[in-house]
Design a protein with these regions (language model features):
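Active-site and donor-binding regions of nucleotide-sugar-utilizing enzymes
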Residues: 17-218, 222, 243-245, 258-262, ...
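Conserved catalytic-core segment of nucleotide-activated headgroup transferases in glycan assembly
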Residues: 63-77, 219-297
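Nucleotide-activated donor-binding/catalytic signature segment of Leloir-type glycosyltransferases, i.e.
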Residues: 94, 98-104, 281-310
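Short acidic active-site motifs
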Residues: 114, 138, 170, 276, ...
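Acidic donor-binding loop of glycosyltransferase active sites
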Residues: 122-126, 304-335
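Conserved sugar-transfer catalytic core signal across GT-A, GT-B, and GT-C glycosyltransferases
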Residues: 138, 247, 314, 338-339, ...
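Catalytic binding pocket for nucleotide-activated donors in carbohydrate/polymer assembly enzymes
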Residues: 178, 321-395, 402-404
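C-terminal alpha-helical cap of glycosyltransferases
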Residues: 408-429
Length: 429
């Protein structure tokens, strides 16, 4: 299978520029930088390579956020970092957040000659793969060029595992190219490594690594125009984070119920996608709720039940401004949940729904520690009211959530130090 893949990648190699130009027309590529994916127009490499150049191959925005604290740690210890990702959103995030000593480049396409150009230019000593997919040419080319290979947070979706097991021999061969494989301690699919006879070690979820960076947002508050005497922070307030269109009726109903039972209540909603705000507004108004949007510039007052935060990048400010954080994407099946660590890092009680496939390992651990509330869509109202009516319970959940997040955030630094020592010890043997 691998030989066929490599042959086909050579055959379609001349077509790759046309593929990227088609994506460019759809707005999916950076017009000034898309050639980086073809091994061209790279930024200047490091004049001083410090302790060595390390390559982090991350899929997209989520993976970029998860490895940023690790990158910061490595840079502070004298390493130079090249981070490659494939999406525009991840590129923008890294542009604004990478430390000096780290650079972002768009990921090379899975073509041997392109990958060799990348390695020749940047001269990395190791590849850290932070992906849910294996790229045969990437793995084999890096190995042949003498790089150490680390599969960090290794996991495969059910669809990916099913696909690869049709070619188990090739799958096993690729996995055995890695010097180190680390998978989440709670990853239920880890038996794929056992079935392939591949050695691996367990680690805490990479999502925990984000916590240290999130704590820097503690002082951010939402800049809201309010009527004289009205202050959201003094109210019983919640924020629904990353709500989806399929959850709008659930959110609207919950707010209606809470408003009827809890005095001085106001809800903020920071939807996952801004273009859903019009339908969200309609669903809220259909429940008889008085709604204002942040972009309207209208003053928020005690007459309002809901403030829709129809702007990007304000979730930390919303969390700090309100009392309880309700993390959406988890109240209907099929989405998989969103980041529950952000409100935990900011010392807020956290409520999430029943459908958190993407965060099951973290939520299970938080439930064991009494650090989160898992609620059905029908129980949101009751859980919110209980928190505001019982201040000691409110403080307990906020404190435990924060303690859990901070404790877990430290495990990755120790792990990375161990990996780096193992990599360079192996190279010196």
């Amino acid at each position: 299978m691998i030989l066929i893949y490599q042959f086909l990648s050579i055959v379609i190699g001349p077509l790759l520029p046309f593929y990227l130009k088609a994506r460019l027309k759809k707005g999916k590529e950076d017009k000034l930088r898309y050639n980086e994916k073809l091994g061209k127009n790279y930024p200047a490499t490091f004049t001083d390579k410090g302790n060595g150049v390390l390559w982090f191959f991350a899929a997209s925005l989520g993976e970029s956020k998860s490895v940023l604290p690790i990158i910061n740690h490595l840079v502070s210890n004298g390493y130079k970092i090249v981070v490659t990702t494939g999406t525009l959103t991840s590129a923008e995030f890294l542009k604004n957040n990478l430390p000096q000593g780290a650079i972002h480049v768009f990921s090379p396409l899975d073509n041997t000659s392109i990958i060799k150009k990348f390695i020749k230019h940047f001269k990395p000593k190791a590849l850290f793969l932070v992906e849910e997919e294996l790229w045969p040419n990437l793995v084999l080319t890096c190995k042949s060029q003498g790089l150490k290979l680390v599969f960090l947070g290794a996991k495969f979706s059910l669809a990916s595992s099913t696909k690869w097991f049709k070619y188990k021999k090739s799958f096993t061969y690729l996995l055995k190219q890695f010097d180190f494989i680390y998978t989440s301690a709670k990853y239920q699919g880890a038996d794929v490594f056992d079935l392939c006879g591949v050695a691996y070690q367990k680690m805490d979820s990479l999502k925990y690594a984000q916590v240290a960076a999130l704590t820097s947002n503690k002082s951010k508050k939402l800049d809201i125009c309010c009527e004289d005497g009205f202050d959201i922070e003094s109210k019983n307030s919640v924020v629904f984070i990353s709500s989806h269109s399929s959850e709008e009726q659930i959110v609207a109903k919950a707010i209606k119920q809470i408003s009827a039972k809890l005095p001085n209540f106001i809800a903020l909603i920071a939807p996952r996608h801004i273009d859903t705000c019009s339908s969200l507004l309609q669903n809220l108004q259909s429940q008889g709720l008085n709604v204002v949007t942040l972009s309207s510039g209208q003053k928020v007052s005690s007459n309002h039940d809901v403030l829709i935060v129809d702007a990007m990048g304000l979730v930390p400010s919303c969390i700090n401004t309100t009392g309880v954080s309700i993390v959406c994407g988890s109240f209907v099946d099929g989405i998989g949940g969103h980041n529950i660590l952000e409100p935990a890092a900011l010392v807020k009680p956290v409520i999430t729904g029943e459908f958190n496939q993407n965060f099951d390992d973290i939520i299970d651990a938080m439930l064991e520690s009494g650090a989160i509330i898992k609620s059905s869509s029908e129980a949101i109202c009751g859980d919110v009211v209980k928190l505001f009516q019982n201040k000691s319970k409110y403080k307990e959940f906020a404190t435990k959530a924060n303690e859990f997040a901070m404790q877990k955030s430290q495990s990755h630094i120790s792990l990375i130090n161990k990996i780096i020592n193992d990599i360079f010890n192996k190279q010196s043997n």
